[in-house]
Amino acid sequence: MEVKQDKAYQQAAGCLPPLRAAQLAALEGQEEVEELRFRAGRPPAVKTARGERGLELAVVTAQELREILSRAARYSVHSYTESLKNGFVTLTGGHRLGVCGTAAEENGKVVGIRGLSSVNLRIARQAWGVDAVIAPWVGEGEPQSMLLLSPPGFGKTTLLREWVRAVSDKGHT
């Protein structure tokens, strides 16, 4: 049976090692996947709106986690130090690779991450029309300022991207 390939999913999976990317390319329901989760010593898992489910694949190794981060950072992890201090690397297409490990500190300041224990690949997707949620507050004129608050995974970035697209489509820059 042929698996329907989802463009956003495939683009995000581009930072994975080739063998793991090939395994996950065969996953059905790619268009529903919100996150790919990789934890050392456990098989990968996928998160959809219906919840998380483990995949029947080989367990993730610490070396594989390091390779995923290295590939996501285009083999230049040091150039992503500022981003890694915040716990993630932004990928082409707006996808984000969250990292979990031990903070490396110098003089009381976080300077990087070591001992990766897991990575989480969040897949960015376009969501047409969600800007209508905030339209009553921003109106047609110049927007003032706004603060978007919600737990992780509730669509703050999606809402903001769609709002910027909608404002841009109306000719505002």
Task: Kindly give the residue locations of the regions a language model identified.
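Conserved lysine of the Walker
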Residues: K156
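N-terminal accessory targeting/assembly segments
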Residues: M1-G93
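Hydrophobic positions on the alpha1 helix immediately C-terminal to the Walker A/P-loop
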Residues: L159, W163
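Hydrophobic anchor at the beta1->P-loop junction of P-loop NTPases
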Residues: M146-L148
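Post-Walker A helix-loop "phosphate-sensing" segment adjacent to the P-loop in P-loop NTPases
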Residues: R165-T173
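P-loop NTP-binding catalytic core
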Residues: L65-E67, R71, V77-P143
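The conserved Walker
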Residues: P152
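N-terminal regions of ATP-driven nucleic-acid and macromolecular assemblies
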Residues: M1, G29, W128-A132, H172
